[in-house]
Amino acid sequence: MSSSFFIPFLVSQILLSLFFSIIILIKKLLRTQITVGTHYYISVISLLALIAPFIPFHFLKSHHFDWILNLGGAQSALSQTHSTDKTTEAIGQHVNWVQDFSLSIEQSSSKMIDSAFFAVWILGVAVMLLATLYSNLKIGKIKKNLQIVNNKELLSLFHTCKEEIRFHQKVILSRSPLIKSPITFGVIRPYIILPKDISMFSADEMKCVLLHELYHCKRKDMLINYFLCLLKIVYWFNPLVWYLSKEAKTEMEISCDFAVLKTLDKKLHLKYGEVILKFTSIKQRTSSLLAASEFSSSYKHIKRRIVTVVNFQTASPLLKAKSALVFTLVLGAILAGTPSVSILAMQKETRFLPGTNVEYEDYSTFFDKFSASGGFVLFNSNRKKYTIYNRKESTSRFAPASTYKVFSALLALESGIITKNDSHMTWDGTQYPYKEWNQDQDLFSAMSSSTTWYFQKLDRQIGEDHLRHYLKSIHYGNEDFSVPADYWLDGSLQISPLEQVNILKKFYDNEFDFKQSNIETVKDSIRLEESNGRVLSGKTGTSVINGELHAGWFIGYVETADNTFFFAVHIQGEKRAAGSSAAEIALSILDKKGIYPSVSR
């Protein structure tokens, strides 16, 4: 997946907005076919889906929308004219294979655009946060100026109402000169604030008001109010979020009205409607960002509340059954769809370890030498134990660069495109920045000099459909084949160091059930050297963006007389992040652990 923020986030918003549009349509079509409570709960759970883009569903995968993501991810083109010779000096005795052969990727201005949109979004969030805090200063002012109710008759009525709805949490009942309509706020310590002048209301009318506000407290509607404010801050740019939030607030009041009507005697139903109208006539103007529940509503929505009162009747078993069915279907759709939205919005896919034998060690000094960050993963076959440095980097996905050529070669062999003894390809005369590339190649020379044009030609002969099937069958990283010939260079295909180690082990043990002769051929092509009876095999990879070293890989394994160690190093930085650097880090760590001693030490 792309490391871009804006495009994946935008795609998630498009998908969520489409989902919200469908939900709104369903609610309108089924307005009288489901209960008022179901309408409210559907709105709430639909809005809960907006959390999904920020939830890391690490163990779920979705490829339904990869084609959309690729519109904005890693928009780059392979540039031969801007290729940069980044060949470094060899490391000690490894002079024969530690070199950086790589073509530069010319990255478009998408990162600048992405950063600009990200800045605009953050600015909008900051403005909305300030506006929300300012709007909710009213609650602080009300608290400072409230007067605790000490009227015995009113307190008696208040406690009677609490008993009727079986609600026993402590609630502070107060009055304030700053409001004209009853208001409720607070979660841990709920407040019900009445207007200062309550003499105009009869006992029955006051009972209607108290029951309504107490139901808000009992149902913890204040949590929903805070949640709706948070959504408006984060998704300030999405009109559907604002619309659905407003609907949820109205339906919250309607469902409270319905609960009150079920509690009241039927003869008081008309009185309840009159109370709603009375407070609406004196409603004061308040902000939609206020994290509180007001008894009064806007004139536009008061009609819906009055219709609920006039048409009130207890839900029939059939209506309850239909409501339960619709709610279950909507909930199922949300649970099924939100992991995909989460993966779309994540900047970098991460795969965590399952319940395995893992130890963490600090190898930061080896990475600090190159002023770069990175991750290291080692797997001990005999002990079935992982050793990891930097869990986050080791389980995050990156473009595989030339390390993918190991599996490109394997597929070409399996497909019959080449064989061990017949893998020759003729150079077409195109001038490349490395003399090793400007000549005919076979599998072994191409793997040794990491000749990109050779493996691109193999991929073209294999075909896109076969490549897609292959990537999925071996579960290579994110399995994203999007840009023919360039997908392992431009970042659409990505894999983590942990996944590199695991797939190398599967390759080594032939868990793919390929021809063993093809496995052995690839093993021979990546065999690097032998030291003290131990054999080192592996492949480096270097990412060069806009002519600058960007990242480096070194993956491989060490065979001893009685064990095999699989490893992967990924390094990224601004100056010295290359395959040769990753190789030096890996060899230093392997030497320190006594797995592959350096000849020079």
Swiss-Prot record:
Belongs to the peptidase M56 family. It is a multi-pass membrane protein. The active site is at residue 402. Keywords: Cell membrane, Membrane, Transmembrane, Transmembrane helix. Residues 1-8, 53-115, 340-601 are extracellular. One of its GO terms (cellular component) is plasma membrane. The gene is blaR1. Residues 27-35, 134-322 are cytoplasmic. Signal peptide: none annotated. It comes from Bacillus licheniformis. The keyword Transmembrane applies. Pfam families: Peptidase_M56, Transpeptidase. It comes from the Bacteria. This is Regulatory protein BlaR1. GO terms for molecular function: penicillin binding. Its main location: membrane.
